[in-house]
A protein has these predicted regions:
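A residue-level marker of the well-folded mature domains of exported/periplasmic proteins
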Residues: 1-168
Length: 168
């Protein structure tokens, strides 16, 4: 358990619609850990890339050697954090978002420090977009402008269900 642990957030702030989703992920994480004994000791912008995630994580673990976990708003930056931590021989757990094929491959390794990725089904997202577009093209108003697409965790307990798929 990671109770009373130091954590780090790898985020991607900005004003594009994609970044709005990233900001929501970060805020959801912060809301969830509030009052539960976690101390966010660092937050950094990895620009959603493996390269930046790796470089900055290397610097962060030097300055904060007691970090126990990194939450990354996407798997690309999470994979960079994973690479830096693996190279440094640090057992710091990484949690990402997207269900990226690369992340799933390392989650599948025995005792991987990349513990989990949260995912949504791109197929479901595509179907919901199609339904909304079809409604708009027909000149009708959609019932809802926001559609909730459920997220789910991919970790060592269910990785076999998702490992062979590029995306869910």
């Amino acid at each position: 358990a990671l109770i009373s642990s130091s954590v780090c957030i790898c985020h991607d702030p900005g004003s594009s619609p994609a970044n709005n989703a990233c900001n929501d992920r970060e805020q959801g994480f912060l809301d969830t850990i509030e009052g539960k004994g976690f101390d966010v000791v660092a937050t950094f912008d990895a620009e959603g890339t493996v390269e930046k995630g790796q470089t900055i994580t290397s610097d962060i673990i030097q300055a904060n050697p007691d970090i126990k976990a990194i939450f990354s708003i996407n798997d690309q930056a999470g994979m960079g954090a994973y690479a830096a931590l693996t190279t440094a021989g640090k057992e710091v757990y990484v949690y990402g978002v997207d269900g990226a094929p690369e992340a799933k491959k390392v989650i599948a390794k025995d005792n991987s420090i990349y513990r989990m990725t949260a995912a949504q089904s791109p197929i479901t997202i595509g179907k919901e977009c199609y339904k909304a577009a079809k409604t708009l093209i027909a000149g009708e108003k959609p019932e809802e402008f926001e559609v909730d697409v459920p997220a789910f965790a991919i970790d060592s307990s269910n990785i076999d269900e998702y490992l062979d798929a590029d995306w869910q």
